[in-house]
Amino acid sequence: VLTLMRYAWGMVPEKFTTPLGKTIIVDKSHASESIVPLDMAREVIRVARMSAYAQLCELPEEQRANYQTLMRREEAKSKWSDQQMLFINQLHLFTVMTLTGKVQLVEKDGDKQVVVQEGKAAKTESCTDTERKKVQDQIMAYVNSAPAPAAAASNAPPPPASPPSKRAEPTPTSQKK
C-alpha cells in the first residue's frame, strides 16, 4: 500500500484543472497535506483492483460505475481537501494502470522510475464468462451497497427511519436544570 501511495504521489501534478474549470494547486513539498490516511488508501486500492479486473474483462460500464461510486462517496463525506481528492483519483488511476500492465517500474541510475506504456495494456489475459460475471457481481454489490459509514450500521433502510425518533429524545434531557 505504501509503495503504491508513493508512486501515485509522484504522479500527482503540481497544478490540475478539473473538467469544470476549477484549478487545484498541490504543494509537492508538503505531501502530508495531500496524501490520505493508510486505511483510506487501502480502500482506494481495493476499489481500484476491481476497476482493473473490469478493464481486463472488457467491462467499461462496470469499471466507470466502480470508480464513480468511490469518488462520489468520498466527495459526499466532505472530509477531504481538493488536493486529497486529487490524490485519491491518482492512487486509483496508478493502481489500475499497474494491475493492467500500463505502468512499469524501470531502474535507472539506481532509482526506480515509473514508465507509462502507451497503447494497449500489456496484460491481455481474457476473462472467462464465469470470471466476467464474478467481477460484474462484485462491482454491482459495491455500487449498490450503502457508503461505508452507513454500512457499518448494518441494514441500510431501517437506520434512516429510526434516527429521527432518537433525535427527539435528547430534548427532554437538555431541559434538565
Model-identified regions with their sequence ranges:
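Mid-chain, structured segments of secreted extracytoplasmic proteins
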Residues: 29-72
